[in-house]
From Swiss-Prot:
This is 3-(3-hydroxy-phenyl)propionate/3-hydroxycinnamic acid hydroxylase. It comes from Mycolicibacterium gilvum (strain PYR-GCK) (Mycobacterium gilvum (strain PYR-GCK)). FAD binds at residues 8-37, 273-283. Catalyzes the insertion of one atom of molecular oxygen into position 2 of the phenyl ring of 3-(3-hydroxyphenyl)propionate (3-HPP) and hydroxycinnamic acid (3HCI). It comes from the Bacteria. The gene is mhpA. Belongs to the PheA/TfdB FAD monooxygenase family.
Length: 569
């Protein structure tokens, strides 16, 4: 595609959000051009924490087994007061989405795996050394121009994943509302970890708050608050850096320093994530403090949410109105993450000793209450997507605790051919219709069943293990899975709904009892602006076929994954 100047999607920025989005679109046969003003990928870590949702997305694009070697799963985060008394601990035990909730990771190595994944596709190209300076929308295209007289490109859509100083956002003319903290931090990355333990800690010491994070591969990050009377130049001095390190390690002069720099925290969100054919994702759309490690992960969520929608529109499986749901769904959740990260930062880093002492007393008192202690330990405070509007259907007959708009769980299951598979590996990468132990074709009716089949949806019947090999409902179009851990039975135990319409990003788009499935299916097609079949605009497919993915090679997860369950973009 070297000479290609006419593509479906231009992605501006080869960071994690842009690379993940390119992989999602590449799998769907969408013609993608990724451009970046740099000459190569950034080779130093910015984000240091991966969550379960990001790993689930990497699983969906077939790259999780390449990413896992660069992670520290199930990483514990401990908060200490000035006397090193434990204030709180975060060690979430469950892996309801298939992966650990907290993982340290080496961002440059993970980003390199995302970049390497694009080599599987002959419909995706990356061009470094291309700085976009103009993009002009017409009725059905966007004309993209670059500095230095480089050839312009015509695309149907442009997605700006070009960071906090986004050129795309500026060209869209949208605001970047929020605040920038006056507090500065010194970040120091060190090879050959001088501490060597696998976990991370925050020192909530009012004299000088600090952070110590185990990344992976023997890399550790230290962060120290810089006092107002200390200049950036002073903080950049190697002697100052060694003095800071000397608070935590015995021989700071012996460390193998990778880099150090001064930074500030931003809490900002774009006024709009979409203007016509231009969209924003990752840091271009939102910036947040580092305290919850959600900057990187929020960019991956953007890519997962936007990717399937763009692919559906470009390949003719949905109307353009579906793209309106991107801002509707992602804005509220990104805002919640920004607010949480900002609040945690305020709790961690007061420099007034009386305020810090009061905080410590409150936290110690709260820790004596088991339910509050579990709330923190299991990270139940983390905002989870629950879409009330967007690409979902909340119908009049839904139960009060309807799962619609939430992420479906991902336990391990058995099929008749494999054991201990992650659920998403059975559901595939597109839509899925899932039911509990029922005849799915009869439940949906032939018309609805045929419409979902034309969109490439997978049909999955969940059964108790005792019924896995019973042939009574066998249908060549329906996969039968056994609930090997009981997690799916437990999930259905607390929900009235037994039929689920699951989106490609694993959000439940609609849920209902079996008898209402045909009408809910029809309503969902309208709500998501889906077509009756895949009327492809490229790729050589015909109605009822999946698009030609133009895949050179797609690595498939093994039946037994190497995973054991858990920024910047």
């Amino acid at each position: 595609m070297t000479e290609q100047t006419d593509v479906d999607v231009v992605i501006v920025g080869a960071g994690p959000a842009g690379l993940t989005l390119a992989n999602i679109l590449g799998l769907e046969g969408v013609r993608v051009l990724v451009v970046d003003e740099r000459d190569k990928l950034i080779d130093y870590p910015r984000g240091v924490g991966l969550d379960d949702e990001s790993l689930r997305t990497f699983q969906a694009i077939g790259l999780v087994d390449r990413v896992l070697p660069h992670t520290v799963p199930n990483q514990i985060l401990r908060f200490f007061d000035a006397k090193r008394n434990l204030l709180a601990e975060m060690a979430p035990p469950d892996a309801r989405f298939g992966w650990p909730k907290r993982n340290g990771f080496v961002q440059p190595m993970v980003d390199a795996e995302l970049f390497g994944g694009l080599q599987r596709f002959d419909n995706v190209e990356v061009r470094f050394g291309h700085r976009m300076h103009q993009c002009t929308q017409t009725t059905d295209r966007v004309e993209v121009e670059f500095d230095g007289g480089q050839a312009s490109v015509s695309a149907r859509y442009v997605v700006g994943c070009d960071g906090g100083r986004s050129v795309t956002r500026r060209l869209m003319g949208v605001s970047f509302d929020g605040t920038t903290s006056s507090t500065r931090w010194l970040v120091v990355d060190i090879a050959n970890d001088p501490l060597g333990h696998p976990n991370s800690e925050v020192g909530a010491d009012p004299r000088r708050p600090y952070v110590s994070i185990a990344i992976a591969h023997g890399i550790r990050r230290f962060e120290f608050m810089i006092h107002p009377d200390e200049t950036d130049e002073e903080a950049d001095d190697p002697a100052f850096v060694r003095r800071m390190l000397g608070q935590l390690i015995p021989y700071p002069e012996r460390v193998d320093m990778i880099r150090h720099r001064v930074y500030t925290h931003h809490s900002r969100i774009a006024g709009s994530f979409r203007e016509g054919r231009l969209m924003l994702a990752g840091d271009a759309a939102h910036l947040m403090p580092v305290w919850q490690g959600q900057g990187y992960n929020s960019g991956i969520r953007d890519a997962a949410n936007l990717g399937w929608k763009l692919a559906a529109v470009v390949t003719g499986r949905a109307g353009e109105e579906l793209l309106d749901t991107y801002d509707v769904e992602r804005r509220k959740h990104a805002r919640a993450m920004i607010d949480l990260s900002t609040m945690v930062g305020r709790v961690i880093s007061p420099t007034n000793r009386k305020v810090a002492a009061l905080r410590d007393r409150v936290i110690h008192a709260a820790s004596a209450v088991p339910s509050l202690k579990r709330y923190v330990l299991e990270m139940r405070f983390k905002p989870m997507p629950r879409y009330q509007q967007g690409a979902v259907l909340h119908h009049a007959h839904a139960a009060p605790n309807s799962p619609t708009g939430t992420l479906f769980i991902q336990p391990r299951v058995d099929t008749r051919d494999t054991q201990n598979a992650l659920l998403d590996d059975v559901l595939g990468t597109g839509f899925a219709v899932v039911c509990w132990s029922n005849n799915l074709r009869a439940v949906l009716g032939e018309e609805a069943f045929g419409r979902w089949k034309a969109l490439g949806a997978k049909f999955v019947e969940v059964r108790p293990m005792s019924q896995l090999r019973w042939p009574g409902h066998d249908d060549p179009d329906v996969a039968v899975i056994g609930d090997r851990t009981g997690a799916l039975k437990a999930w259905f135990d607390v929900h009235t709904e037994s039929v689920l319409f699951v989106r490609p990003d694993r959000c439940i788009a609609a849920a209902c009892i079996a008898q209402r499935a045909p009408e809910i299916s029809e309503g969902l097609f309208a709500a998501l602006h889906l077509t009756s079949g895949a009327h492809l605009t490229q790729g050589g497919g015909t109605d009822g076929e999946k698009p030609d993915r133009a895949v050179l090679h797609v690595a498939q997860p093994a039946a037994e994954s190497s995973g054991t369950g858990a920024g910047t973009s």
